[in-house]
From Swiss-Prot:
Organism: Borreliella burgdorferi (strain ATCC 35210 / DSM 4680 / CIP 102532 / B31)
Signal found in the keyword field: no
Annotated Pfam families: EAL
EC number of this enzyme: 3.1.4.52
Name assigned to this protein: Cyclic di-GMP phosphodiesterase PdeA
UniProt-listed InterPro entries: Cyclic-di-GMP_PDE-like (IPR050706), EAL_dom (IPR001633), EAL_sf (IPR035919)
Function: Phosphodiesterase (PDE) that catalyzes the hydrolysis of cyclic diguanylate (c-di-GMP) to pGpG.
Domain of life (superkingdom): Bacteria
Amino acid sequence: MNKVNNYQNINSVIISKKEVGLRDLIKLKSIFNLIQIVKSEKALYSEYVKQNNIKFAIIYNYEKPIDFSINIANELKNANKIHSIIISKEKFDEEYLKLDHIEIIKDISELEYKQSLIHQKKLFCDNKNTTLDFFLNLSELIKEIVIITNTKNEIIYINEKGSKNLNLPMKTSGNIIKVTDIDIRDWEKLEKINLSYHTNSIPEFKNILITDCLLTLKNNKKLHVDIFISTIAQNNIDKLITIKEISNSNKIENYKYLEIIDSQDEIQNAKEIEKLLVNHMDIYKKKSIYLLNLDVSLTAEYEYKEDQEKLNAKILKIMYSKIMSLYSEYIFKLKHNNLIVIISTSGGEKRIISIAKKIKKTIALAFKKEDIIIFKFNIGIIEVNLKENLEFKIPKLMMATKISSEYKESNPTIYKEELPEAVILKNQNKIFQYILKAIKNDFFTLYYQKINPLKKNLKPKIEILTRLFDHMGKPIPNNQIFNLIDKYNLTVEVDTLVVKKALREYKSFVSKNGIHIFSINISPYSLKSQNFRIFLRDTLLKSQIPLQNICLEITETGILENFEIINKYFQELKSFGIKLALDDFGSGHTSLSYIKTLPIDLLKIDGSFIKAINSSEIDFVIIKSIKKIADTKNIKIIAEFVYNEEILKKIIELEIDYGQGFLWHKPEPI
């Protein structure tokens, strides 16, 4: 009987700059339903991918560094949710093996025994809306034992650490290993813990934490662990089980009951915390005391979604309840969404880091269920001594939180005197090195956001946005990228890449979307370079694109020091019909002089004014005044950061010409 293949009905493409050998083609056709062979991922337009239901891309990596293919795979995943198999003999960082949407093999023959694993990873990747994110974030979980079970409680996936350490029966033909084969017991009663229930039978418990367990490993080794069970309940996959070592001690002491101090005022001198600790000295004997600062930042997409006060209350309620369910300790509220948590433990730094990660993961999962999208979740930690003045500890705790944000995965960070500048510089250097690599290999990805006309006689536009994803496929915050690009004078290199890419995509985008006017961001620092000015002018003139459909956006920051050069250059571009826009108008100190002198067609009012238009009479008056002045010069106004109907009503009242923001369109790959 022939073995049933998981891929025969899965449409796939091959990306290869060279001709694929006959042997490889035959093997691939026996595994995949191949649709096409292309030389570049640029041939895979979103419409084509959807029409052909393409799920896999087989990427041949010839001669170039593996990062080049990883970047292609990341673009395919972000734009079209395609899973990639990279064939490469190049050496690569083992971190790439943790990527859920990529498999790397040296030769086609490896597919013979990796089919099942690849299919499983693809299944996980396609179900990211579920609690599978807990599994997909293997960068944090990979050091622990991870198990996936089906609805029959059979183990269908176990990671390397689990297979090496768990005392399981040897797998033979017809012998299915079940979760009941794992010897895990209650620490005190030594009763075997039942992991064989069906998660659908207890829907109120989507995520379960079982603490203080005794796990028997190979060679009869005993381990003190916590178990985290996460419900999946999709595609015959029932639950995910994570087993985490917590301590070598005989017993973790019970925590005291939680007391919430919910003060709206920021803690200035920490006397409130100090008083609490002194009054409960008996609780903390023989234990180390730690303060944890939990700092949550939301994506802009969610941050402007609803009333901010209601949103903050919702976030704090989730954070309180989840911390209370894990650790009965004390919580202080700071401004915004910051919480300070007091936790005592006898397990040292390793244990407090483990606790912080557990808090972070549990809260993140709770946010996900409420469709709250987190941009960053940083945790700073500092050990405190009852004899010390806590006034001097709080600023250091905030520094630890800042350091946490510099780590790629925002790992919880314990404050140490030698840490701050060294860590920040180290991580900035990593990002800078990656930017250099991105410039060399053209890793930047173009996104776009629609600019909507608010008057009948105007046409829609789009703004071209630049995004950079790291080697794990995660977006690097733009402020980090462009601060370093400006700092190290790389604006010319980046702007050159963006201009070339935008013009290359123009015809394809217009044919699919019907929007003809492109707005491309140019740094004023790039315009200092005569070579760049010549390149930009000549490239636009040779592009065969109607020049009246091209708009160049320049931020007002940086214009003043090169004002004469930029003004003269703008006059030249304007003579060719190219449109010019001034971005972030109002953020500088000499804005009005720009309106009088520069030959601009559009003003984009700084978002800080638009966001406050309903709450600040001053901002409303400023916008109204800018509009009046612009009208005298026949300059059109674009309002950025329009994220709700209330703001829209105000800008329509002011007769603003265009609106841009999440109310209409979220940025997406071009």
